[in-house]
């Protein structure tokens, strides 16, 4: 597929998205099927053109996991799981398993946790294979922890994200807390992978905190007004990580890591917030 073909396909997809949300001549079920068709088409396009998929289309695709029709959610998440397992889809799409979680007792919690463990295992396999071939190359994007910057940004831009300046009730932040907790517990908790390889827990903890610190030293490249929300989510993530790894709290985490340029822009040091 050349660039012209990609943009033609993207135009058709945008048209489908629009009519699936705003058409008044179609039933709700028809619109849901159109949204699913568009999302599945995006997943197929990303196999070769992931770097060309706009951020807003990426988010629209992920939010099929929040669709009002349970069957659409199930079909979409099944396809995401399949493509990631086949290594035909970037692990960042695992965010789709997370943004629909708003409580520990959500029926799909254990299923999504299992899916995330599989995604983490796939990332670890890719990382180890690449390290054995090119040990001097920065392979952070192959780390399962690299899902974090995408999840933080997705949560900050999700309609369910509360305004951090207006809400004082901790329950309002459940849509933020539980997705973060599920991902971090998969990476750092007892049900995760850190005990399978010596030193993995420490490495994962350091990488996790380095990612959060790097985000706190950045601004939102899509909407600068969301920067404060990004930083607040990172503060929450750091607290969760430290609670999951109390024996690692004193580990140094000064490493700066590169972040997805589509989502984050660097800021001057004097603009950085104080670390947690």
What are the roles of these predicted feature ranges?
Residues 1-87:
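Alpha-solenoid helical repeat scaffolds
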Residues 1-27, 110-276:
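Long internal repeat-built scaffold domains in very large eukaryotic proteins
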Residues 37-44, 59, 78-82, 95, ...:
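Residue-level signature of alpha-solenoid helical repeat scaffolds
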Residues 38-41, 65, 100-101, 112, ...:
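Small-side-chain structural scaffolding
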Residues 72, 96-106, 137, 141-145:
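Short, highly charged low-complexity linear segments
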Residues 82-92, 98-124:
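C-terminal, active-site-flanking charged/polar segments
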Residues 93-98, 129-133:
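Juxtamembrane/interface motifs at transmembrane-helix termini
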């Amino acid at each position: 597929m050349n660039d012209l073909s990609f943009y033609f396909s993207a135009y058709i997809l945008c048209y489908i998205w629009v009519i699936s949300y705003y058409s008044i001549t179609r039933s709700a079920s028809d619109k849901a099927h159109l949204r699913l068709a568009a999302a599945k088409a995006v997943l197929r396009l990303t196999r070769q053109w992931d770097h060309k998929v706009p951020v807003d289309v990426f988010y629209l695709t992920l939010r099929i996991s929040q669709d009002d029709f349970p069957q659409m959610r199930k079909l979409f998440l099944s396809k995401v799981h399949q493509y990631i397992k086949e290594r035909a889809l970037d692990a960042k799409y695992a965010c789709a398993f997370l943004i629909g979680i708003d409580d520990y007792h959500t029926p799909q919690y254990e299923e999504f946790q299992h899916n995330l463990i599989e995604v983490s295992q796939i990332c670890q396999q890719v990382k180890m294979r690449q390290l054995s071939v090119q040990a001097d190359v920065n392979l952070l994007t192959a780390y399962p922890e690299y899902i974090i910057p995408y999840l933080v940004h997705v949560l900050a831009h999700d309609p369910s994200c509360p305004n951090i300046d207006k809400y004082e009730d901790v329950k309002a932040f459940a849509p933020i807390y539980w997705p973060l907790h599920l991902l971090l517990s998969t990476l750092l908790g007892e049900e995760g992978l850190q005990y399978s390889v010596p030193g993995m827990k420490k490495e994962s903890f350091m990488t996790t905190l380095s990612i959060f610190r790097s985000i706190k030293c950045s601004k939102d490249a899509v909407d600068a007004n969301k920067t404060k929300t990004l930083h607040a989510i990172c503060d929450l993530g750091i607290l969760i990580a430290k609670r999951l790894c109390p024996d690692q709290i004193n580990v140094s985490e000064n490493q700066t890591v590169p972040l997805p340029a589509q989502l984050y822009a660097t800021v001057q040091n004097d603009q950085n917030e104080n670390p947690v």
